[in-house]
Protein backbone atom coordinates (compact mmCIF):
# COMPACT_ATOMS: atom_id res chain seq x y z
CA UNK A 1 0.00 0.00 0.00
CA UNK A 2 1.00 3.58 -0.56
CA UNK A 3 2.09 5.28 2.64
CA UNK A 4 -0.04 3.54 5.26
CA UNK A 5 0.27 0.01 6.57
CA UNK A 6 -3.12 -1.61 6.15
CA UNK A 7 -3.77 -4.72 8.17
CA UNK A 8 -5.35 -6.87 5.44
CA UNK A 9 -7.62 -8.64 7.95
CA UNK A 10 -11.39 -8.88 7.95
CA UNK A 11 -13.24 -6.87 10.58
CA UNK A 12 -17.01 -7.04 11.03
CA UNK A 13 -17.33 -3.86 13.08
CA UNK A 14 -19.62 -1.30 11.36
CA UNK A 15 -17.71 1.09 9.14
CA UNK A 16 -17.77 4.86 9.17
CA UNK A 17 -17.09 6.24 5.68
CA UNK A 18 -16.67 9.91 4.76
CA UNK A 19 -17.63 10.70 1.16
CA UNK A 20 -16.41 13.66 -0.87
CA UNK A 21 -17.89 13.74 -4.38
CA UNK A 22 -17.14 16.47 -6.92
CA UNK A 23 -19.51 19.44 -7.22
CA UNK A 24 -21.65 17.88 -9.96
CA UNK A 25 -24.99 16.16 -9.55
CA UNK A 26 -23.86 13.46 -11.98
CA UNK A 27 -21.17 12.58 -9.42
CA UNK A 28 -23.17 13.26 -6.26
CA UNK A 29 -26.00 10.88 -7.19
CA UNK A 30 -23.85 7.73 -7.63
CA UNK A 31 -21.93 8.54 -4.45
CA UNK A 32 -25.23 8.88 -2.61
CA UNK A 33 -26.39 5.51 -3.94
CA UNK A 34 -23.28 3.93 -2.41
CA UNK A 35 -23.98 5.82 0.82
CA UNK A 36 -27.50 4.40 1.00
CA UNK A 37 -26.29 0.88 0.27
CA UNK A 38 -23.67 1.13 3.02
CA UNK A 39 -26.30 2.47 5.40
CA UNK A 40 -28.68 -0.34 4.48
CA UNK A 41 -25.93 -2.77 5.54
CA UNK A 42 -25.59 -1.06 8.93
CA UNK A 43 -22.59 1.18 8.20
CA UNK A 44 -22.31 4.93 8.82
CA UNK A 45 -21.67 7.64 6.25
CA UNK A 46 -20.66 11.28 6.52
CA UNK A 47 -21.63 12.81 3.17
CA UNK A 48 -19.86 16.09 2.41
CA UNK A 49 -20.85 18.70 -0.16
CA UNK A 50 -22.06 22.26 -0.57
CA UNK A 51 -25.39 23.41 0.91
CA UNK A 52 -27.21 23.89 -2.40
CA UNK A 53 -26.07 20.54 -3.76
CA UNK A 54 -27.18 18.68 -0.65
CA UNK A 55 -30.55 20.39 -0.91
CA UNK A 56 -30.79 19.18 -4.53
CA UNK A 57 -30.24 15.55 -3.53
CA UNK A 58 -33.08 13.08 -3.07
CA UNK A 59 -34.27 12.80 0.50
CA UNK A 60 -32.58 10.19 2.65
CA UNK A 61 -35.05 7.34 3.29
CA UNK A 62 -36.40 7.62 6.83
CA UNK A 63 -35.04 4.26 7.97
CA UNK A 64 -31.53 5.26 6.84
CA UNK A 65 -31.42 8.70 8.45
CA UNK A 66 -29.65 7.43 11.62
CA UNK A 67 -26.82 6.12 9.43
CA UNK A 68 -26.25 9.01 6.99
CA UNK A 69 -25.07 12.42 8.11
CA UNK A 70 -25.30 15.12 5.45
CA UNK A 71 -22.69 17.83 6.02
CA UNK A 72 -23.15 21.17 4.27
CA UNK A 73 -19.88 23.06 3.83
CA UNK A 74 -20.30 26.54 2.32
CA UNK A 75 -17.99 27.26 -0.60
CA UNK A 76 -15.66 30.25 -0.29
CA UNK A 77 -16.27 33.18 -2.60
CA UNK A 78 -14.03 33.00 -5.65
CA UNK A 79 -13.44 35.79 -8.14
CA UNK A 80 -15.10 35.09 -11.51
CA UNK A 81 -17.30 32.33 -10.06
CA UNK A 82 -20.93 33.48 -10.47
CA UNK A 83 -22.79 34.24 -7.25
CA UNK A 84 -24.63 31.18 -5.97
CA UNK A 85 -22.85 28.72 -8.25
CA UNK A 86 -22.17 25.48 -6.38
CA UNK A 87 -22.36 22.89 -9.14
CA UNK A 88 -21.30 22.35 -12.73
CA UNK A 89 -24.98 22.66 -13.66
CA UNK A 90 -24.93 26.29 -12.46
CA UNK A 91 -22.19 27.45 -14.85
CA UNK A 92 -20.83 26.93 -18.35
CA UNK A 93 -18.03 24.36 -18.48
CA UNK A 94 -15.47 27.10 -19.12
CA UNK A 95 -16.06 28.35 -15.57
CA UNK A 96 -15.20 25.00 -13.97
CA UNK A 97 -11.71 26.27 -13.17
CA UNK A 98 -13.26 28.66 -10.65
CA UNK A 99 -15.58 26.00 -9.22
CA UNK A 100 -12.47 23.86 -8.72
CA UNK A 101 -10.86 26.68 -6.71
CA UNK A 102 -13.95 26.92 -4.53
CA UNK A 103 -13.89 23.15 -3.99
CA UNK A 104 -10.24 23.28 -2.98
CA UNK A 105 -11.17 26.04 -0.56
CA UNK A 106 -12.97 23.44 1.57
CA UNK A 107 -9.69 21.92 2.75
CA UNK A 108 -9.63 23.52 6.20
CA UNK A 109 -13.27 22.66 6.92
CA UNK A 110 -12.81 19.09 5.67
CA UNK A 111 -9.65 18.69 7.75
CA UNK A 112 -11.48 19.83 10.87
CA UNK A 113 -14.37 17.49 10.11
CA UNK A 114 -12.15 14.45 9.56
CA UNK A 115 -10.22 15.16 12.74
CA UNK A 116 -13.35 15.25 14.88
CA UNK A 117 -15.34 12.49 13.14
CA UNK A 118 -12.40 10.09 12.63
CA UNK A 119 -13.91 7.89 9.89
CA UNK A 120 -12.50 4.51 8.85
CA UNK A 121 -12.28 5.59 5.21
CA UNK A 122 -12.47 8.62 2.97
CA UNK A 123 -14.06 7.91 -0.42
CA UNK A 124 -13.03 10.77 -2.69
CA UNK A 125 -13.73 11.83 -6.27
CA UNK A 126 -11.29 12.64 -9.08
CA UNK A 127 -11.24 16.35 -8.18
CA UNK A 128 -10.52 15.82 -4.48
CA UNK A 129 -6.91 14.63 -4.53
CA UNK A 130 -6.25 17.43 -2.04
CA UNK A 131 -7.99 15.39 0.68
CA UNK A 132 -5.39 12.59 0.55
CA UNK A 133 -2.62 14.26 2.64
CA UNK A 134 -5.26 15.58 5.03
CA UNK A 135 -6.70 12.12 5.63
CA UNK A 136 -3.32 10.47 5.93
CA UNK A 137 -2.22 13.03 8.52
CA UNK A 138 -4.97 11.51 10.69
CA UNK A 139 -4.06 7.93 9.67
CA UNK A 140 -7.28 7.54 7.67
CA UNK A 141 -7.01 5.42 4.49
CA UNK A 142 -8.38 6.77 1.22
CA UNK A 143 -10.31 5.04 -1.54
CA UNK A 144 -10.77 6.67 -4.91
CA UNK A 145 -14.29 5.94 -6.15
CA UNK A 146 -14.42 6.35 -9.92
CA UNK A 147 -18.01 6.63 -11.17
CA UNK A 148 -16.99 5.67 -14.73
CA UNK A 149 -15.76 2.27 -15.97
CA UNK A 150 -12.16 1.12 -16.13
CA UNK A 151 -11.80 1.73 -19.86
CA UNK A 152 -11.79 5.48 -19.19
CA UNK A 153 -8.83 5.21 -16.83
CA UNK A 154 -6.91 2.83 -19.08
CA UNK A 155 -7.57 4.76 -22.31
CA UNK A 156 -6.71 8.21 -21.00
CA UNK A 157 -3.79 7.17 -18.79
CA UNK A 158 -1.63 4.85 -20.93
CA UNK A 159 1.73 3.59 -19.69
CA UNK A 160 4.40 6.04 -20.78
CA UNK A 161 6.64 3.27 -22.08
CA UNK A 162 3.86 2.04 -24.38
CA UNK A 163 3.24 5.37 -26.12
CA UNK A 164 5.38 5.96 -29.20
CA UNK A 165 4.43 9.62 -29.23
CA UNK A 166 1.77 11.97 -27.95
CA UNK A 167 0.46 13.09 -31.32
CA UNK A 168 -3.26 13.69 -31.72
CA UNK A 169 -3.57 10.51 -33.79
CA UNK A 170 -1.77 8.46 -31.14
CA UNK A 171 -3.89 9.86 -28.31
CA UNK A 172 -7.20 9.39 -30.12
CA UNK A 173 -6.73 6.05 -31.86
CA UNK A 174 -7.55 2.59 -30.51
CA UNK A 175 -4.89 1.52 -27.96
CA UNK A 176 -2.49 -0.83 -29.74
CA UNK A 177 -0.53 -1.61 -26.57
CA UNK A 178 -3.30 -3.56 -24.84
CA UNK A 179 -3.07 -7.37 -24.58
CA UNK A 180 -6.52 -7.59 -26.20
CA UNK A 181 -8.07 -6.07 -29.31
CA UNK A 182 -10.46 -3.13 -29.18
CA UNK A 183 -11.80 -0.63 -31.66
CA UNK A 184 -12.72 2.09 -29.19
CA UNK A 185 -11.34 5.52 -29.92
CA UNK A 186 -12.09 9.19 -29.72
CA UNK A 187 -12.17 11.52 -32.68
CA UNK A 188 -9.77 14.46 -32.98
CA UNK A 189 -12.58 17.02 -32.90
CA UNK A 190 -13.86 15.46 -29.64
CA UNK A 191 -10.46 15.80 -28.00
CA UNK A 192 -9.97 19.37 -29.22
CA UNK A 193 -13.50 20.37 -28.20
CA UNK A 194 -12.91 18.99 -24.71
CA UNK A 195 -9.61 20.85 -24.43
CA UNK A 196 -11.06 24.15 -25.60
CA UNK A 197 -14.06 23.68 -23.34
CA UNK A 198 -11.87 23.93 -20.24
CA UNK A 199 -10.60 27.45 -20.99
CA UNK A 200 -12.25 30.54 -19.55
CA UNK A 201 -12.16 33.17 -22.29
CA UNK A 202 -12.20 36.07 -19.83
CA UNK A 203 -9.12 35.08 -17.84
CA UNK A 204 -7.45 32.41 -19.97
CA UNK A 205 -7.51 29.97 -17.03
CA UNK A 206 -8.25 26.27 -17.47
CA UNK A 207 -9.67 23.64 -15.15
CA UNK A 208 -6.76 21.31 -14.50
CA UNK A 209 -7.15 18.39 -12.11
CA UNK A 210 -4.33 16.32 -10.61
CA UNK A 211 -5.69 13.00 -11.87
CA UNK A 212 -2.38 11.22 -11.47
CA UNK A 213 -2.39 11.96 -7.74
CA UNK A 214 -6.08 11.10 -7.42
CA UNK A 215 -5.50 7.73 -9.05
CA UNK A 216 -2.05 6.77 -7.77
CA UNK A 217 -2.16 7.88 -4.12
CA UNK A 218 -5.20 5.90 -2.99
CA UNK A 219 -5.26 2.75 -0.87
CA UNK A 220 -8.15 1.20 -2.80
CA UNK A 221 -9.30 1.91 -6.35
CA UNK A 222 -13.08 1.52 -6.60
CA UNK A 223 -15.03 1.67 -9.84
CA UNK A 224 -18.71 1.65 -10.75
CA UNK A 225 -18.42 -1.22 -13.19
CA UNK A 226 -18.53 -5.00 -13.52
CA UNK A 227 -16.54 -7.77 -15.15
CA UNK A 228 -19.54 -8.57 -17.33
CA UNK A 229 -19.27 -5.11 -18.89
CA UNK A 230 -15.50 -4.86 -19.27
CA UNK A 231 -13.61 -7.87 -17.91
CA UNK A 232 -10.57 -7.34 -20.16
CA UNK A 233 -10.20 -3.70 -19.12
CA UNK A 234 -10.55 -4.54 -15.42
CA UNK A 235 -7.97 -7.32 -15.70
CA UNK A 236 -5.53 -4.94 -17.36
CA UNK A 237 -6.09 -2.23 -14.75
CA UNK A 238 -5.76 -4.65 -11.83
CA UNK A 239 -2.61 -6.17 -13.30
CA UNK A 240 -0.93 -2.81 -13.71
CA UNK A 241 -1.97 -1.08 -10.50
CA UNK A 242 -0.19 -1.06 -7.16
CA UNK A 243 -3.33 -1.13 -4.99
CA UNK A 244 -6.38 -3.40 -5.04
CA UNK A 245 -8.84 -2.62 -7.85
CA UNK A 246 -12.39 -3.33 -6.71
CA UNK A 247 -15.49 -3.08 -8.93
CA UNK A 248 -18.52 -2.13 -6.83
CA UNK A 249 -20.94 -3.31 -9.51
CA UNK A 250 -23.12 -1.12 -11.68
CA UNK A 251 -25.55 -0.01 -8.93
CA UNK A 252 -28.47 -0.59 -11.32
CA UNK A 253 -31.99 0.66 -10.55
CA UNK A 254 -32.91 -2.72 -9.05
CA UNK A 255 -30.27 -2.07 -6.35
CA UNK A 256 -31.23 1.52 -5.64
CA UNK A 257 -33.12 2.37 -2.47
CA UNK A 258 -36.14 4.47 -3.47
CA UNK A 259 -39.57 5.41 -2.16
CA UNK A 260 -41.57 3.43 -4.73
CA UNK A 261 -44.95 4.30 -3.20
CA UNK A 262 -44.23 8.02 -3.43
CA UNK A 263 -43.10 7.61 -7.04
CA UNK A 264 -46.25 5.66 -7.95
CA UNK A 265 -48.48 8.42 -6.58
CA UNK A 266 -46.57 11.29 -8.18
CA UNK A 267 -49.07 13.32 -10.29
CA UNK A 268 -46.53 13.76 -13.09
CA UNK A 269 -45.99 10.02 -13.31
CA UNK A 270 -49.75 9.35 -13.34
CA UNK A 271 -50.14 11.72 -16.30
CA UNK A 272 -47.15 10.25 -18.17
CA UNK A 273 -48.29 6.67 -17.49
CA UNK A 274 -51.75 7.44 -18.85
CA UNK A 275 -50.14 8.53 -22.13
CA UNK A 276 -47.72 5.60 -22.28
CA UNK A 277 -50.61 3.18 -21.69
CA UNK A 278 -52.13 4.34 -25.00
CA UNK A 279 -48.98 3.47 -26.99
CA UNK A 280 -48.12 0.14 -28.58
CA UNK A 281 -45.63 -2.14 -26.86
CA UNK A 282 -41.94 -1.29 -27.49
CA UNK A 283 -42.87 1.56 -29.85
CA UNK A 284 -41.82 4.72 -27.99
CA UNK A 285 -38.31 6.17 -28.03
CA UNK A 286 -37.25 7.81 -24.76
CA UNK A 287 -34.96 10.79 -25.38
CA UNK A 288 -32.91 12.24 -22.55
CA UNK A 289 -29.52 13.90 -22.26
CA UNK A 290 -29.21 14.36 -18.52
CA UNK A 291 -29.61 17.49 -16.44
CA UNK A 292 -26.28 19.13 -17.26
CA UNK A 293 -25.65 18.73 -20.99
CA UNK A 294 -26.13 22.06 -22.73
CA UNK A 295 -27.05 21.59 -26.39
CA UNK A 296 -26.31 24.32 -28.90
CA UNK A 297 -29.24 25.84 -30.77
CA UNK A 298 -28.01 24.23 -34.00
CA UNK A 299 -27.85 20.77 -32.43
CA UNK A 300 -31.23 21.17 -30.74
CA UNK A 301 -32.82 22.21 -34.03
CA UNK A 302 -31.36 19.30 -36.02
CA UNK A 303 -32.23 16.86 -33.25
CA UNK A 304 -35.86 18.03 -33.12
CA UNK A 305 -36.26 17.85 -36.89
CA UNK A 306 -34.70 14.37 -36.87
CA UNK A 307 -37.12 13.17 -34.22
CA UNK A 308 -39.97 14.56 -36.28
CA UNK A 309 -38.71 12.95 -39.51
CA UNK A 310 -38.38 9.55 -37.81
CA UNK A 311 -42.17 9.44 -37.40
CA UNK A 312 -41.71 7.46 -34.18
CA UNK A 313 -43.69 7.97 -30.97
CA UNK A 314 -41.42 9.70 -28.47
CA UNK A 315 -41.06 11.03 -24.94
CA UNK A 316 -38.44 13.79 -24.81
CA UNK A 317 -37.21 14.81 -21.35
CA UNK A 318 -35.98 18.34 -21.97
CA UNK A 319 -35.69 19.78 -18.48
CA UNK A 320 -32.78 22.11 -19.21
CA UNK A 321 -34.43 23.92 -22.13
CA UNK A 322 -34.12 27.64 -21.36
CA UNK A 323 -36.91 29.59 -22.98
CA UNK A 324 -35.60 32.64 -24.77
CA UNK A 325 -32.10 31.11 -24.93
CA UNK A 326 -32.80 27.84 -26.73
CA UNK A 327 -35.95 27.25 -28.74
CA UNK A 328 -37.49 24.23 -30.39
CA UNK A 329 -38.26 24.69 -34.10
CA UNK A 330 -41.39 26.74 -34.64
CA UNK A 331 -44.46 24.52 -34.62
CA UNK A 332 -42.57 21.37 -33.58
CA UNK A 333 -44.71 20.58 -30.56
CA UNK A 334 -47.94 21.26 -32.42
CA UNK A 335 -46.96 19.06 -35.37
CA UNK A 336 -45.88 16.14 -33.16
CA UNK A 337 -48.42 16.35 -30.34
CA UNK A 338 -50.37 13.32 -31.56
CA UNK A 339 -47.38 11.00 -31.20
CA UNK A 340 -44.98 12.62 -28.79
CA UNK A 341 -44.46 14.53 -25.55
CA UNK A 342 -41.85 17.19 -24.81
CA UNK A 343 -41.54 17.17 -21.01
CA UNK A 344 -39.87 20.32 -19.69
CA UNK A 345 -39.78 19.61 -15.96
CA UNK A 346 -38.37 16.75 -13.88
CA UNK A 347 -39.34 13.37 -15.34
CA UNK A 348 -39.56 10.08 -13.39
CA UNK A 349 -37.06 8.42 -15.70
CA UNK A 350 -36.90 5.00 -14.05
CA UNK A 351 -40.68 4.64 -14.04
CA UNK A 352 -40.81 5.60 -17.71
CA UNK A 353 -37.98 3.26 -18.72
CA UNK A 354 -39.72 0.35 -16.97
CA UNK A 355 -42.93 0.85 -18.95
CA UNK A 356 -43.63 -1.69 -21.69
CA UNK A 357 -44.27 1.01 -24.30
CA UNK A 358 -40.60 2.05 -24.38
CA UNK A 359 -38.77 0.41 -27.28
CA UNK A 360 -35.42 2.16 -27.12
CA UNK A 361 -33.61 5.27 -25.95
CA UNK A 362 -31.56 8.14 -27.26
CA UNK A 363 -28.77 9.09 -24.87
CA UNK A 364 -25.64 11.19 -24.42
CA UNK A 365 -24.01 8.09 -22.89
CA UNK A 366 -23.29 9.36 -19.40
CA UNK A 367 -22.42 6.32 -17.27
CA UNK A 368 -25.46 6.52 -15.01
CA UNK A 369 -27.76 7.10 -17.95
CA UNK A 370 -26.39 4.08 -19.82
CA UNK A 371 -26.75 1.79 -16.81
CA UNK A 372 -30.36 2.83 -16.21
CA UNK A 373 -31.39 2.36 -19.83
CA UNK A 374 -29.57 -0.91 -20.53
CA UNK A 375 -30.84 -2.26 -17.18
CA UNK A 376 -34.29 -2.33 -18.77
CA UNK A 377 -32.97 -4.00 -21.92
CA UNK A 378 -33.32 -0.96 -24.15
CA UNK A 379 -31.27 -0.50 -27.30
CA UNK A 380 -29.48 2.86 -27.41
CA UNK A 381 -29.10 5.53 -30.06
CA UNK A 382 -26.13 7.55 -28.85
CA UNK A 383 -25.16 11.18 -29.31
CA UNK A 384 -22.17 11.69 -26.98
CA UNK A 385 -20.47 15.00 -26.20
CA UNK A 386 -17.91 14.60 -23.39
CA UNK A 387 -14.88 12.33 -23.76
CA UNK A 388 -16.05 9.68 -21.30
CA UNK A 389 -19.42 9.62 -23.07
CA UNK A 390 -17.72 9.14 -26.43
CA UNK A 391 -15.76 6.15 -25.13
CA UNK A 392 -18.84 4.56 -23.57
CA UNK A 393 -20.71 4.99 -26.85
CA UNK A 394 -17.92 3.17 -28.73
CA UNK A 395 -17.83 0.37 -26.14
CA UNK A 396 -21.58 -0.15 -26.50
CA UNK A 397 -21.25 -0.16 -30.28
CA UNK A 398 -18.46 -2.71 -29.97
CA UNK A 399 -20.82 -4.88 -27.90
CA UNK A 400 -23.54 -4.34 -30.52
CA UNK A 401 -26.18 -2.94 -28.17
CA UNK A 402 -26.08 0.64 -29.48
CA UNK A 403 -25.66 2.69 -32.63
CA UNK A 404 -24.20 6.19 -32.77
CA UNK A 405 -25.64 9.03 -34.84
CA UNK A 406 -23.15 9.77 -37.68
CA UNK A 407 -21.31 13.06 -37.24
CA UNK A 408 -18.92 15.21 -39.22
CA UNK A 409 -15.29 14.29 -38.56
CA UNK A 410 -14.48 17.98 -38.87
CA UNK A 411 -16.67 19.54 -36.19
CA UNK A 412 -19.06 16.91 -34.83
CA UNK A 413 -22.14 18.34 -36.50
CA UNK A 414 -24.96 15.99 -37.50
CA UNK A 415 -28.02 16.14 -39.74
CA UNK A 416 -31.70 15.62 -39.08
CA UNK A 417 -31.78 12.93 -41.77
CA UNK A 418 -29.10 10.90 -39.99
CA UNK A 419 -30.91 11.31 -36.66
CA UNK A 420 -34.12 9.98 -38.21
CA UNK A 421 -32.40 7.08 -40.00
CA UNK A 422 -30.48 6.03 -36.88
CA UNK A 423 -33.58 6.14 -34.70
CA UNK A 424 -35.57 4.01 -37.11
CA UNK A 425 -32.69 1.55 -37.57
CA UNK A 426 -32.42 0.98 -33.82
CA UNK A 427 -36.10 1.01 -32.87
CA UNK A 428 -38.12 -0.48 -35.74
CA UNK A 429 -36.11 -1.54 -38.81
CA UNK A 430 -35.54 -5.25 -39.36
CA UNK A 431 -31.81 -4.58 -39.87
CA UNK A 432 -31.60 -3.39 -36.26
CA UNK A 433 -33.28 -6.43 -34.71
CA UNK A 434 -29.96 -7.98 -33.63
CA UNK A 435 -29.11 -4.82 -31.68
CA UNK A 436 -32.44 -4.97 -29.90
CA UNK A 437 -31.97 -8.62 -28.97
CA UNK A 438 -28.41 -8.00 -27.75
CA UNK A 439 -29.65 -5.12 -25.58
CA UNK A 440 -32.27 -7.37 -23.99
CA UNK A 441 -29.61 -9.95 -23.16
CA UNK A 442 -27.29 -7.35 -21.68
CA UNK A 443 -30.23 -5.99 -19.69
CA UNK A 444 -30.52 -9.35 -17.92
CA UNK A 445 -26.93 -8.97 -16.70
CA UNK A 446 -27.31 -5.32 -15.73
CA UNK A 447 -30.48 -6.05 -13.74
CA UNK A 448 -29.26 -9.15 -11.89
CA UNK A 449 -29.68 -8.43 -8.18
CA UNK A 450 -27.79 -11.59 -7.24
CA UNK A 451 -24.80 -10.54 -9.32
CA UNK A 452 -24.66 -6.96 -8.09
CA UNK A 453 -25.30 -7.90 -4.47
CA UNK A 454 -22.13 -9.96 -4.66
CA UNK A 455 -20.20 -6.96 -6.01
CA UNK A 456 -21.50 -4.84 -3.14
CA UNK A 457 -20.51 -7.45 -0.58
CA UNK A 458 -17.02 -7.77 -2.10
CA UNK A 459 -16.69 -3.97 -1.95
CA UNK A 460 -17.69 -3.85 1.73
CA UNK A 461 -15.41 -6.80 2.49
CA UNK A 462 -12.50 -4.85 0.94
CA UNK A 463 -13.26 -1.82 3.12
CA UNK A 464 -13.33 -4.08 6.17
CA UNK A 465 -10.21 -5.98 5.19
CA UNK A 466 -8.02 -2.95 4.58
CA UNK A 467 -9.28 -0.61 7.28
CA UNK A 468 -6.79 0.62 9.89
CA UNK A 469 -7.75 -0.47 13.42
CA UNK A 470 -6.53 2.79 14.96
CA UNK A 471 -8.84 4.78 12.69
CA UNK A 472 -11.93 3.31 14.32
From Swiss-Prot:
Similarity section: Belongs to the UDP-glycosyltransferase family.
Reaction(s) the record says it catalyses? soyasaponin III + UDP-beta-L-rhamnose = soyasaponin I + UDP + H(+)
Q: Which GO terms describe its molecular function?
A: soyasaponin III rhamnosyltransferase activity; UDP-glucosyltransferase activity
- PANTHER family in UniProt: GLYCOSYLTRANSFERASE, SOYASAPONIN III RHAMNOSYLTRANSFERASE
- Please name the Pfam families in this protein's record: UDPGT (PF00201)
Q: Which residues bind an anthocyanidin?
A: 27
Q: Which UniProt keywords apply?
A: Glycosyltransferase, Transferase
Task of the protein: Glycosyltransferase that transfers a rhamnosyl group from UDP-rhamnose to soyasaponin III in the biosynthetic pathway for soyasaponins.
Instruction: Enumerate the residues binding UDP-beta-L-rhamnose.
Output: 291, 347, 364, 368-369, 372
The EC class name is transferase
- Any idea of its EC number? 2.4.1.273
Tell me the InterPro entries matching this sequence: UDP-glycosyltransf_plant, UDP_glucos_trans
Active site at 27, 125
Full protein name: Soyasaponin III rhamnosyltransferase
**Keyword check for Ligase:** no
Amino acid sequence: MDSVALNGKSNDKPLHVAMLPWLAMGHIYPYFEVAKILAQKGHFVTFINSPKNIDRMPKTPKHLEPFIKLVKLPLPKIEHLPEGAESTMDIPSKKNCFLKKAYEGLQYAVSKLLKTSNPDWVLYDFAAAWVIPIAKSYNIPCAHYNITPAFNKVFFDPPKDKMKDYSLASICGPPTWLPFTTTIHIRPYEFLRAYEGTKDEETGERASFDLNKAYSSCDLFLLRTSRELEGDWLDYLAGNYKVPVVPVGLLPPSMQIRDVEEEDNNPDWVRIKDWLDTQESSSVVYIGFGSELKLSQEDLTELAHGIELSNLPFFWALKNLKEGVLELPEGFEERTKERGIVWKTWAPQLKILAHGAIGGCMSHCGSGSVIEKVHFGHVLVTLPYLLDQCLFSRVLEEKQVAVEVPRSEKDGSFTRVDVAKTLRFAIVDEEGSALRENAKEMGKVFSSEELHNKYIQDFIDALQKYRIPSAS
